[in-house]
């Protein structure tokens, strides 16, 4: 299983995905989540989770970042479905964030009309 760049995201696609994990990293390492969180994300992929890791550049406008990473994530899902790389009609989606990524997933779930099976929040940062 190799990382693929799709619509500004880094994606791991197992042969038979059981769920989708949208991963957002911490503020200082968020620009390359496929490298800085490689061990964790590839372990998830090996367990059958389709991983979409969305890089971002940190600014003080966290709602704008949340909107941007959500748009990139949704574009990646659309592209995966259009190219038949994602064949399942429905898979549960989990948001997973570390530090600043936690805050972004909380903003995404609070501000935007999305459906998530749940969020996994690792070391929440409240700045």
Model-predicted segments: where are they?
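Short, surface-exposed "cap/lid" segments of acyl-processing enzymes
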Residues: 2-59
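Alpha/beta-hydrolase superfamily serine-hydrolase fold, recognizing
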Residues: 12-14, 85, 117
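Amphipathic alpha-helical scaffolding segments
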Residues: 38-42, 68-72, 124
């Amino acid at each position: 299983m190799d990382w693929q760049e799709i619509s500004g995201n880094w994606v791991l696609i197992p042969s038979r995905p059981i769920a989708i994990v949208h991963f957002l990293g911490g503020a200082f390492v968020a620009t390359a989540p496929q490298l800085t969180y490689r061990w964790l994300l590839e372990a998830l992929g090996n367990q059958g989770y389709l991983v979409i890791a969305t890089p971002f550049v940190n600014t003080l406008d966290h709602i704008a970042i949340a909107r941007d990473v959500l748009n990139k994530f949704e574009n990646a899902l659309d592209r995966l479905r259009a190219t038949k790389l994602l064949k399942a009609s429905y898979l549960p989606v989990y948001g997973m964030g570390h530090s600043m990524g936690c805050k972004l997933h909380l903003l995404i779930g609070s501000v935007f009309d999305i459906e998530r099976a749940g969020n996994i929040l690792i070391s929440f940062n409240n700045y």
